[in-house]
Amino acid sequence: MLNSGHGHQTLGKLLSRCLRGAAGIAAGIGLAAAATSALAADAHCDVVVIGAGGSGLTSALSAAEAGAKVIVVEKMPFIGGNTVLATGFMLGVPKGEPRELELLESDMIRKGGRTTDQALLTRIVSGSGEAVEWLRSYGAELEPLCITRDDSLQTACNLNEDGTVSKRGIQPKRGLIGPEIINALLHGIESHGVPIRTRTAVKRITTDAEGRVNGVVVLNTKGREYRIDAPAVVIATGGFSANEAMVSRFARHTQGLQSTNSPAATGDGILLAENMGARTVDMHAVTVHPTTLPFSGLILPHQVRVNGAILVNDKGERFADELSEKLAEQIRDKNSGRAWLIFDQAMIDDMPVLKSYARSGYFIRGTSDLELARGIRVPPEKFHETLVRYRSMVDRQEDTDFGRPQLLSRLDSSPLYAVSVRPGIHTTLGGLKIDPRARVLSDKGPIAGLYAAGEVTGGVLGARRLEGAGLTAAIVYGRIAGTEAAAWAKLRAKTKPAAGTGG
């Protein structure tokens, strides 16, 4: 019998579930209730935040903490952005760990390459521990996760190259990291009375006669325009992986891949700021995740493979080191663009993300090697032979086929599970050029009153990023952007505003 633990599952039913999956999670399953509504009249505030994902909510909450009146506008009917979809961990170095700060910064520079803006990166590293404590102050239940420094070898409590345990990883005590962060931010947003206007898209950011930001023009779902007057605007709209035209223009090598991001990641904020003369950087830099669920774009995170999962092709054979940084290319170029991820019950028991997906019915299950092989329609004898060989290599702790450096599971805890995976666009690392104060830059310098945080920015993490660094950057720069925007609004309030141009 073939099932996922929730009744008989055909491949057709699994595909149907995948189609519904991303929308269900993005809609905020398990999230705190938030008072949201569309904008129905003109308004005035100190700071407008565009986007209600992790960086946007962080910016809004930080601005409110600084005493600013804030309005958040979100074009989608739900909140959470990409952050609510996060299933891994974030990075945060505790106070009193200067060596850890040095190691994290050097590793991020090594990973990001020559395009990394070190001044921007240094602020992420130095602010990472405080960002974690700040989230905890709003109820996030987070705990350390010991990981190796090598991004390709992240696992529980391994040693650094210098013999010390890395203390940089931060995970939730229960559940998934994305909902945990968004929940905490929503608690803070509610306590500060910050309104979130969903189904409200920004048409343009306006400036006064001297080029200073003075508000936004928005559209509601009925196509009606409203204006929000504000001396400061924070752009936190995410990347552009869901915009096929922008992907084709800037990252042609990833054309045809699905996006793992929120459907809201259409590059709106980049385009809005470019119309104001903003600079962009690293627009070609895109990370591809090797193991995403077809149709839904949900990811099976790196840790699943670290903890022992393997990949097989339609012949039932392994074809690569599952921890290789080139795994996505190997799946796409050498294996018809897809593969089967194989794991066992022990891994589901240990990993909240697998438990969550299992409950949603994404996995095919078999009580033996042969039964699972028949379920996924690969040659049963060859699949069994592959697993027998792999288990023997685990026993010897040596992968003589592909040189996989970690062999943590024999995959013999029945039942066994499989899920079809393929590469997908995971992060667009290019975007708006900012300075360490999160001010958006033009060729002439900072655009007065305009700030940005999160995946809408570029140069922050370079051409590649460490696992967990994206969440950390979103929170650290969200806090900076919100605080700086509030300070600018307070300064502008002391002077008489120039006449608005509306454009």
Residue ranges and their predicted role:
Residues 42, 59-62, 356, 430-492:
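C-terminal structured subdomain/cap of oxidoreductase catalytic cores
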Residues 41-55, 71:
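Beta1/beta-strand and adjacent pyrophosphate-binding region of the FAD-binding site
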Residues 126-224, 243-246, 394-413:
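Conserved redox-cofactor binding core of oxidoreductases
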Residues 65-84:
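Glycine-rich FAD pyrophosphate-binding loop
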Residues 270-274, 278-382:
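An anion/pyrophosphate-binding glycine-rich loop and adjacent beta-alpha core
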Residues 221-293, 477-480, 484:
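Glycine-rich loop(s) and the adjacent beta-strand/alpha-helix scaffold that form part
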